[in-house]
UniProtKB/Swiss-Prot annotation:
Its EC number is 1.14.13.248. It comes from Aspergillus oryzae (strain ATCC 42149 / RIB 40) (Yellow koji mold). Pathway: Mycotoxin biosynthesis. Belongs to the nitrosuccinic acid synthase family. It is an enzyme of class 1 (oxidoreductase). Disruption phenotype: Completely abolishes the production of 3-nitropropanoic acid. Nitrosuccinic acid synthase; part of the gene cluster that mediates the biosynthesis of the deadly neurotoxic nitroalkane 3-nitropropanoic acid (3-NPA) that acts as an antimetabolite of succinate and irreversibly inhibits succinate dehydrogenase and disrupts mitochondrial oxidative phosphorylation. NpaA catalyzes the iterative oxidation of L-aspartic acid to nitrosuccinic acid (2-nitrobutanedioate). Alternative amino acid substrates such as L-glutamate and D-aspartate are not accepted by npaA as a substrate, showing the strict substrate specificity toward L-aspartate. It comes from the Eukaryota. InterPro entries: FAD/NAD-bd_sf, HpyO/CreE_NAD-binding, L-asp_N-monooxygenase_NS-form. Its cofactor is FAD. One of its GO terms (molecular function) is monooxygenase activity. It catalyses: L-aspartate + 3 NADPH + 3 O2 + 2 H(+) = 2-nitrobutanedioate + 3 NADP(+) + 4 H2O. Pfam families: NAD_binding_9 (PF13454). This is Nitrosuccinic acid synthase npaA. The lineage of its organism: Eukaryota, Fungi, Dikarya, Ascomycota, Pezizomycotina.
Length: 649
């Protein structure tokens, strides 16, 4: 069925735009569009916004309200919002609204400002925001919901857009289309296909990278040996679903948490390349708006890096940017350490910042302030705390429990007074500044690949966006209860005798045989390997292209600078198509992070820019030939021609 613009009274303008994806970013884009509509629409003009998502609008699929209450956000309630505030630098009007905490307080949900809400609770907030946006839409603006997937997008002869839905319905005559999708499925690579085929042939289970909320775990039997490959946020989701999600419970004792099994749990084994779980987030002591204000990453420094990148002399992340990140982190660590020991800070900050990273002068400053070698910051010790040791099975288990207990203890000291967690939280607080530097080809292709994608981004995730402290405490209790074991670094899963034998080369003698292998991670954004029909259609027809930096494909959908127009295979930016969010990862950095109040959230300024550009397209008239903008080509140095660096911390 084809849906086109209906007839309107003579002299009345009726424009149509579409937003594909109605999770947090799509909902934010809709809110921003409604906020700015009166800046663009003439008196009496009409605008219909078509929102396209098979899941309930607002929450979308990831944050849907019909998911297990065992699944938590990893951000405290007071630091989550979908509304602009006075801190947000954007062209559109500021329309303040409640944060998740303020909304939950009004709704009497009993959530404290520093508690971690469930994902379903956040979904309820998002659905409420969507309803409020619809209810308060300005005169002449109406929102039409399409519970469907978008499967293709094409130009009409008059330059407007035609969007085809999975229901067979076609929306034509669209003046603008905004893609605001979240995490999308991928076509499995050869290695994953091989594992799945082996599982099918032997009556095993292989669960590919997925959102745990989307996975049917009911076939896992009590006591069945299961290996979870990955110790990040997805691991903790599976851990919860397979324990308290099956009727087990935790109780508090003087010695910590104790787990009381239901008898329905599988026997879980876990591991990752690093061998240890993401570090617990420090208990929040910063309130809703508190953050580390950059000491080194000033506007002048950021502008300097950008000017170099824009002139074709992009900086090297490891050599030029990383030392500054490290200096910011270490400054906060040492100041908190000195306060913890009752020392006066005096001129410590000025002297420490005046020295070069890892220099003899820096070490002398630490000596002058009485900071011993034992208490000095070590990225090696933090990223690989077991060093080069190998362990027996029993020694590894004992070491792991002690490590987890220490991590929980450090987290309890908070992200202000606890030296370790205060320092690691700096990495989270600096995300906006780093985005300004590295986004849109801010690094060379080689540095983007080896230093950012393959090294710093995983390190940043491991250290600064981990689970709440309670998850680490639960993990300890599950190990003590014999429900869970961590196998060690660099685990290998070998197919043999109709099952998988899993072991770590660094814990000799510890081998387990499992019948279910769970890839405990989300699929990485990859335009070339996406299973999303809409993006696949655009790629196959040359209407979009993968983002590249000096020949290195980052995996993201290529877009321009703000307002993020989609670029086709010929390097032309489409005037009526825009994209924000996870599919653009690579062009932008850490796109999965949500909006936070009071800190000029880039998510909100991005959706504002896209919304206003879409409105501009809606009122610009319908030309027979759509104008497209040629995008500047960057110097193309093939990554294959450059020697790969081995990067350590």
């Amino acid at each position: 069925m084809k849906y086109s613009i209906p007839a309107t009274p003579s002299g009345t303008t009726h424009a149509h735009v579409a937003i594909v994806g109605m999770g947090p970013r799509g909902t934010s884009a809709l809110e921003r569009l409604c906020a700015s509509a009166t800046d663009f629409l003439a008196p009496g003009a009409r605008l219909t916004v078509h929102v396209v998502d098979p899941s309930p609008p607002g929450a979308g699929r990831v944050w849907r309200t019909a998911q297990s209450s065992e699944l938590l956000m990893n951000t405290v309630t007071s630091q989550v919002t979908l509304y602009t505030d006075k801190s947000v630098v954007c062209s559109g009007p500021i329309r303040e609204g409640p944060s998740l905490y303020e909304w939950a307080t009004d709704a009497k949900l009993g959530l404290g400002p520093d508690e971690y809400p469930t994902r379903a609770q956040y979904g309820h907030y998002l659905e409420w925001v969507f309803r409020e946006v619809v209810r308060n839409a300005p005169t002449g603006v109406e929102i039409e919901v399409h519970a469907a997937r978008a499967v293709s997008l094409d130009d009409a002869p008059d330059g407007r857009q035609t969007l085809t839905l999975s229901t067979g319905r076609t929306l034509s005559g669209l003046s603008a289309v905004v893609l605001a999708q979240g995490h999308l499925p991928l076509v499995a690579d050869a290695q994953l296909q091989q594992l799945t085929a082996y599982a099918d042939q032997n009556g095993l289970r292989h669960i590919t990278p997925s959102n745990p909320a989307d996975v049917d775990l009911s076939s896992l039997k009590p006591g069945e040996p299961v290996f979870l490959r990955g110790l990040g946020l997805n691991f903790f989701d599976y851990m919860a679903l397979l324990t308290t999600g099956r009727g087990g419970r935790f109780s508090r004792t003087p010695n910590g948490l104790r787990y009381h099994p239901s008898g329905r749990e599988p026997r879980m084994y876990a591991g990752s390349r690093r061998g240890i779980p993401y570090q617990a987030r420090g208990d929040n002591a910063k309130g809703a708006y508190g953050r580390h204000m950059p000491l080194i990453f000033t506007e002048e420094v950021i502008d300097g890096f950008r000017q170099r990148a824009d002139s074709g002399n992009a900086p090297n992340f490891l050599k030029e940017i990383w030392p500054l990140v490290s200096k910011e982190v270490e400054t906060v660590y040492y100041e908190a350490l000195l306060r913890q020991h009752g020392f006066e800070l005096g001129d410590f900050r000025d002297r420490f910042l005046a020295t070069a990273h890892k220099s003899l002068e820096e070490a002398q400053v630490l000596t002058d302030f009485g900071i011993t070698e034992e208490n000095r910051w070590s990225w090696d010790r933090i990223s690989r705390p077991y060093g080069e040791r190998t362990f027996t099975a029993g020694a590894w288990r004992d070491w792991m429990l002690e490590y987890l207990r220490e991590d929980a203890k450090e987290a309890s000291l908070g992200n202000v007074n606890g030296p370790l967690k205060a320092a690691l939280d700096v990495m989270r607080d600096l995300r906006n500044e780093l985005r300004l530097i590295v986004d849109h080809a801010g690094l060379s292709g080689l540095s983007h690949r080896d230093h950012l994608d393959r090294w710093y981004t995983p390190l940043n995730a491991f250290l600064s966006i981990g689970p709440p402290r309670q998850r680490i405490e639960q993990m300890i209790a599950l190990i003590e209860a014999g429900i869970l074991d961590v196998l060690g670094p660099r685990p290998q899963a070998r197919a043999e005798d109709g099952a998988w034998t899993v072991y770590s080369p660094e814990v000799p003698g510890l081998k387990v045989r499992v019948t279910t292998l769970i890839e405990a991670r989300l699929p990485e954004p990859s335009l070339r390997h996406t299973a999303d029909e809409l993006l696949s259609h655009l790629l196959k027809t040359g209407q979009c292209r993968p983002h590249t930096v000096d020949g290195y494909e980052t995996g993201g959908l290529d877009i321009t600078l703000s307002p993020y127009r989609i670029i086709d295979s010929q390097g032309r930016a489409h005037e009526r198509r825009f994209a924000v969010g996870v599919p653009t990862e690579g062009v932008h950095w850490v796109t999965a992070a949500g909006a936070r109040p009071g800190v000029n959230s880039v998510t909100l300024s991005d959706t504002d820019a896209v919304a206003r550009a879409a409105l501009s397209a809606a009122v610009s008239g319908n030309t027979a030939v759509e104008r497209q903008t040629e995008v500047k080509a960057w110097p193309n140095v093939e990554v294959s021609e450059v020697t790969v660096l081995e990067v350590g911390v």
